[in-house]
Regions:
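Conserved acetyl-CoA-binding loop of GNAT-fold acetyltransferases
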Residues: 118-128
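Conserved beta-strand-loop-alpha-helix junction that forms the acyl-donor binding cleft
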Residues: 80, 105-115, 132-136
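Residue-level recognition of the GNAT/N-acetyltransferase active site
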Residues: 58, 76, 109
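Residues at secondary-structure transition points
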Residues: 61-65, 83, 109
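Conserved acetyl-CoA-binding loop-helix of GNAT-fold acetyltransferases
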Residues: 75, 81-94, 120
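Conserved GNAT acetyl-CoA-binding A-motif
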Residues: 89, 96-109
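Acetyl-CoA-dependent GNAT
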Residues: 4-65, 71, 134
Length: 136
């Protein structure tokens, strides 16, 4: 992620994150410490950002290995229901599976109304706080 892309991702996430200082620090860590996680950005045909995912890594005693923590998935309203989010999650699953990561977890609350979206992408409800996808 370049410095310019970092600012674009910040602008995409900032409306839902009141603590802009913490968001800025987290995005800086994603740039400086790729071993901690990564940010993927989805572009449209005009090279405009239409969405992104932020993923960090954690050791899970429940899963018995390393899991990818989907910290955020954001798709611009005009790009929703066009396959951007599904594409991001499917690419994520393929990528982290190749890294021997055993699952993907998210803390996206069920209250956000995304249960059918995550279910269609192979996730199951983990608890009231999120969803999980086991990778074989």
């Amino acid at each position: 992620m370049s410095a310019a892309e970092r600012m674009d991702v910040f602008a995409l996430l900032a409306p839902k994150r009141p603590d802009h200082v913490s968001l800025g620090k987290a995005l800086t860590l994603f740039v400086e410490r790729e071993d901690f996680g990564f940010v993927w950005i989805a572009f449209d045909d005009n090279e405009s950002i239409v969405g992104c995912v932020l993923v960090s890594f954690a050791i899970s005693t429940d899963a018995g290995g390393l899991v990818a923590c989907l910290d955020d998935i954001v798709v611009f309203p005009g790009a929703r229901r066009t396959g951007v989010g599904t594409g991001l999650l499917e690419t994520l699953a393929t990528h982290v599976r190749a890294m021997d990561i055993v699952g993907i977890r998210t803390s996206v609350p069920r209250a956000f109304g995304l249960e059918s979206f995550f279910s269609a992408c192979g996730f199951s409800v983990r608890d009231d706080q999120g969803f999980t996808r086991t990778l074989a």
